[in-house]
Amino acid sequence: MKKLALLAFTLLSAWNMDAKTITGPVDYVSPLVGTQSKHALSTGNTYPAIALPWGMNFWVPQTGKMGDGWTYTYDADKIRGFKQTHQPSPWINDYGQFAIMPITGKVVFDQDQRASWFSHKAETATPYYYKVYLADHDVVTEIAPTERAAAFRFTFPDNDSYVVVDAFDNGSFVKVIPSENKIIGYTTKNSGGVPENFKNYFVLQFDKPFTYTAAVANGNIDTNKLEAKDKHAGAVIGFKTNKGEQVNVRVASSFISPEQAELNLKELGSGNVDQIAAKGRKVWNDVLGRIEVEDDDIDHLRTFYSCLYRSVLFPRSFYEI
């Protein structure tokens, strides 16, 4: 009986209970359903995949520690970063992952030190758009994905503001290119079953010049270097921002080469977060709308379309443009 009550609470708490107009099947979807899970007890073992149907890459707010299969749990209260993920389940774990995290004030890289408190009341999660307020840094993060890329928008306070790029700890490389407002690199992080030469190459294109740069090797932040190649590489770049100032970042990756990652970046076109989210919403409505369900109980519709959303995340596209 206790387990049934817990399951009911999990499902109810994961729905967005605010009244809203349903204009398409994607409005029934809650990516948070099934996320109140842990190693000892599963209520779904899901994570909120911010993605397009069958996309090559997904994005997820990361509450779990680096390498933890339970990358997002509903009862967590801190976000460590926003991770590109390819994870099918917590038991299989992830591969080719790296993370981005906006911070303010003191420069930090460590995943615990950079983590920020958040509330579900200040979180919007849909398949095509994610938004959250990071209270400790006073930063709003927004994400809109395409199949191989994503647009980020950070709204910063009046402060010294930074973006951390963490390529994780299985052998990685990160390079800051200030003249191009760009960061490139690769991660080899995986959980097995990959080729010997496996790499996920990534590129981040910013719309604002850097006023601070540092390379990070195994936790050591070095402002005299622009690149790091080590077991655990990363970078921190920064800006002096005014209250409400927005910094846009366009991110793409490739399993083929750095040059291909740059090509995949073109998938975003010239659209901003709002425009890319609108296109993603249409894609989701087109796919989910292939099956029309009628029911007088809105919770049944929410359950059906939330499950259908999960069904069309895989198999993922494994080809590049």
Where are these regions (language model features)?
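Bacterial Sec-dependent N-terminal signal peptides
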Residues: 1-21
